[in-house]
Amino acid sequence: MYIKLSNLFQRLQNLAKRSRTATKPRSLILLILLFVLSLSIPLVAHQVSALSIIVQTQQNPLQLVEQAKKLYTTGQFEQAALVWQKTAEGFAAQGDNLNQAMALSNLSLTQQQLGKWAEAKQAIATSLKLLEIQEKTPTQRLIQAQTLDIQGQLQLAVGRSQIALKTWQQAADIYKNIGNKHKFIQSQINQAQAMQELGLYRRACEILLESLELEHQDLDISKQQLQTLTEKFSGTGDLASLQVLGLRSLGDVLRVIGNSEQSQLILAESVKLAKQFGDSQNLAAGYFSLGNTVLSLGNQKAQIETISTPITFTSSPDCMARANNTVSELYQQAAACYHQAELSTDANINAKAKLNLLSLLIETQQWSEISTLLPKIQSQLDKLPMSHGAIYAQINLAQNLICLKSAVNPEVSQLSSPLLQQCGVSQEKTTNTGGNTLQPTLIPAWEDIAKIVTTARNQAQVLQDNQAQAYALGYLGGVYQEIGEIPNAQRFTQEALQLVSAFDAPHIAYRWQWQLGRLRRIQENQQGAIAAYTAAVETLKSLRKDLTVINPDIQYTFRDSVAPVYREFVDLLLQANNSNQTNLKQARDAIEALQLAELDDYFRDACIEAKPQQIDRVVDKATPAAAVLYTITLPDRLELILKLPGQENLEHYTTTVTQAQLKDNLTQLIERLNDKTRFAGEIQELSQQTYDWLIKPAQSKLVDSKVKTLVFVLDGLLRNIPMAVLYDRASQEYLVQKYALVITPGLQLISPRPLANVRLNAMLAGMSEQRSFPDENQLFSNLKFVPNELGKIQKQVPNNEKLLDQYFLKATLQEHLANAKYTIVHLATHGEFNSDPEKTFIATWDHLIKIKDLDKLLRSGKTNQPISIELLVLSACKTATGDSRATLGLAGVAVRAGARSTLASLWSVNDESTSELMGEFYSELVNANGRKNVSKAEALQQAQLALLNNRDRNKKWERPYYWAPFVLVGNWL
């Protein structure tokens, strides 16, 4: 329990008077509030909640304790340490081991503030030894747990995160055993800090939700739950700081795992409560965290918005993002948050806020603000005591300076250090060409950056912080690579890898393996480079469960931090002098791994858990004959790998086309395809060029192998194009007229088997009337032909259930799916595929079902196992316009739903033509059920050809707009 100090002192004075009249001295107990501790976790301002210690003393030592406390709270740590030392010596002279231990714990805490890690370690070790020999009373156990809390902070501060986690777990066990709920919650929050440092973000999120007593599913928290939590703790003074801290920690974790909107909601509540309670330190830390989240929202929006004007900071908004904010507004709001955090008297928060603000200013090229801020940062870093966090702050400054050089001189070679790759996003976000007004003296030399990193490395050596040392060594390698001293660059990089091999840190290892691969390419050591890239790719595979651990201290982007590793590896393997069957198969595996990693990044989760089968085996056994075409886009060319049926060797083709040329062609083609007024000739004008790039090189091999089904593993913008529309000018045929077509997100299939062997049982649902969802800013037009569409399917699949309009409720659909095993789930309703999973949805009458909820909807009620859905059909969906990653949403739906095959539309189509196409498709499926030689892919092909061959001039269904958008994903059999 907590006791007010004013009441406590009076009670102790009374006890002291009585003790002087006693025949034997008695041990007296004093509760002293330990102080809010700052955890130095890179670029995330975390706090360990207030700790209490118990001290027992007579009048004079009591005065020393009060004096030490006042010195500590006013930041006079040197003097406070001296007083705590005297207090400990006084207790030792009295033989009062319990209070001596408490004084030593406080001494350790104070020495940590001074960066005197050896002395702090000695003090806490002595304290724990003294506590071990005391009688195991509840009081002793409480003191021991609190001392362990202080030891955990010390361990975390010097980079011993795993040990700190174990220490705090021990403390939590004690608090639980003695029934101290509040302290138990505090220790859970502390554990979450260590978990974040270790990259265990999902575990951290789970323990924080548990500590805040929030029920959750898949780490989602509702607004109602947050409101209930706020009301529950409202006005509870003892728990106020704990609640603020817990919410902030939770908000930080939610941001890292990809739930930025929820993160903002929770962090805003944390800031609100800190203001309410007058907690200035937690308020500053809350603004810092909120700035990080608003920046993350801006970065997400920047990936899908075209920024045509320079980003300028012209106003001073509050730092709360809103749904309709532009990228520029979000960045300004993030800057406003950082400015609020800069007001903190806490040196750690102040420094981190300045560093993240600098990063944002560099990304948006705010030269005058950079000129003002940059000189302040190093002086601020000089105020930090040496610690794990201070080391990472120096490294972060180095990264910012690297990005500053890159922004001033954006020429970045593919063989530059990956450190420059981290800055790639800034050059696409900004078009600020108003002139570089940055003072030349503020543009750092590489040698100056090397000095900063060397300082960080030396400090890491002093602390014996191997993780920070490995990080710093790798950075030194990258800096020397840019200087041009390749031998030194390789030496430092290999030293970093040697050091990291002694402990489990794949998020560090892969970066330096990647860097080593680039260095060896510079030296034309091709085999050595392949070995390094192979190691990097294997390390990334081990990180599948949590790719966000890769770079939590610097804004993480999959495009800049992960995807280039795979692309460069394939580039290396497929160079003319390297191309052989071993390399071709390795390149194909790398393409598949990239596809899988992109989906993991999309969900911020390793979402594919089913046991996959090699497509090769399916291809070789498939009837009719099928082939698989793998694509990967590289800066100067398009690489194609072809797997033909019955052939062990892979075919390899290279098409010389730059990324810019490919993007221009595909972007124009997408625009024309989405315009129903476009004539077929206008589409063919562009799609024949795409055909020549993708299909023509392999055309003769496909003919010779009598291929009837073509399976695509597509890369980048190619995923946004329906392959059916590619046009062969020689034969004057679309690709769909030659082959049945299917897309797969890699070598993964979910237990493929022919539909002909399955008894069809359909769940049919749709929405035909106009519906509005104001909270989601969505208005859906009516789909008057949906009843006709569902009616046609009912005739073909008599064993069915139907939910239409007001009967198509989320709960009703879930109930039906839980109580029956359907082989087909057909949803004729609005939906959208978006690069943001939170904006990828399927509409029911009363809900927008988000993609992350879809798999829960498609699970049986009792076993919670995926239903064996053979086919999921989404017949009225669309892809977000201009969003290059949007079709990941389609692949994500296919994977997340657990369906063997998914049929969906890439853009909204006239629902009358859709009704016609779906009728034809199901007619073919029913025939397939009686004829084993008709696959789902062939059924779709025949349905599309039915529209393509329709010559009704009034309907114009022969135009690609009507028949082309439907794509089959997954199992084509």
Regions found by a protein language model. Give the residues of each.
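An often Trp-containing, charged/polar helix-loop segment at the C-terminal end
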Residues: 24, 343, 914-973
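N-terminal leader/linker segments that initiate helical-solenoid repeat arrays
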Residues: 37-106, 142
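Residue signature of alpha-solenoid helical repeat architecture, marking inter-repeat boundaries
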Residues: 58-59, 78, 98, 142, ...
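Alpha-helical solenoid repeat scaffolds used for protein-protein interaction
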Residues: 201, 205, 209, 213-225, ...
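Catalytic-core domains of enzymes
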Residues: 621-622, 717-824, 839-844
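Catalytic cores of nucleophile-dependent amide-cleaving enzymes
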Residues: 743-747, 752, 823-920
